[in-house]
Amino acid sequence: VTLNIVIGIPTVGRAPILRETLRALARQSRRADRIIVCGTKPSDVVGAADIHGAEVLLSSPGLPAQRNALIAAAPQADIMVFFDDDFLPDPDYLAAIERHMAGDPTIVVATGLVLKDGIGGPGLAVNEAEAVLRTARPSPLGVLPTFSGYGCNMAVRLTTMRQHGLRFDERLPLYGWQEDVDLSRRLAAYGEVVKIDAACGVHLGVKQGRNSGVRLGYSQVANPLYLAGKGAGYPLMRALEHIGRNMAMNIIHAARPEPYVDRRGRLRGNLLALADLIRRRMVPERVLEL
């Protein structure tokens, strides 16, 4: 079985790193049928259309809206592989996705093995990521059930999404925050969500182009509670654990924050969301007013 596999890359404010990522995609042993990039304004995608036939489109702002625009632009695709604009996949990433998702039609979401993730630190340089990829020896057989896909690298079966009318939830504005988990849990009602070790890569975790700490902090509280309240497979206990873990990190580091994380802004956002919760006016969209 040959699948039609399209890569979709949502991007904002990081055109130089996007171009590096597109160049890296030329090394895939199984070429994508199409590569589509979605920005929110022309400056997001400068130079992208010149690289390996990448197609470029613009959508309204917000990661879920961009993801939905990418899906809408690929009506013929069986699978869409979402990469962040700063994720460098192993050359056999798409081949591994096709092997497993063609071989097992019950897989509706597949996420890869992140060999190194710069999101928890200052971020990684492209040459560091390439060094990690050169020495990686992922297991060709490792496929395990997992709770959700990780948005920086996740493959979704679009045929299943279309059949059941599923989309990313655009009530989660800006950076999305948990939009990947929400969609994974809704798709889990119709099949398997797995992690495929052979589909590996490195997430640079570039800090440029990310949102304000206050807004992100608000979303860290508001989004999980909103998703749990939908009753669509996102458990309340998971939401509470997620909020507790993030708030604890923000409190611990607020006095001496890492230079690359706005901990005080995030903590302020956490507290604003809790205050709104008490007043019964907490909704994900409120971040747009902050």
Regions found by a protein language model. Give the residues of each.
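Active-site nucleotide-sugar/metal-binding loop of Leloir-type enzymes
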Residues: 64-79
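Short, acidic, metal-binding catalytic loop of nucleotide-sugar glycosyltransferases
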Residues: 23-32
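Short beta-strand-to-loop acidic/aromatic patch adjacent to the donor-nucleotide binding site
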Residues: 77-88
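Active-site donor/metal-binding and catalytic loop motifs
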Residues: 175, 192-213, 224-227
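A short, conserved alpha-helix in the catalytic core of glycosyltransferases
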Residues: 149, 153-156, 160-165, 170-199
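Non-catalytic, C-terminal membrane-associated alpha-helical segments of glycosyltransferases
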Residues: 214-223, 233-290
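Short, flexible, basic/aromatic active-site loop/helix in glycosyltransferases
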Residues: 128-147
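Conserved donor NDP-sugar-binding/catalytic core segment of glycosyltransferases
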Residues: 92-125
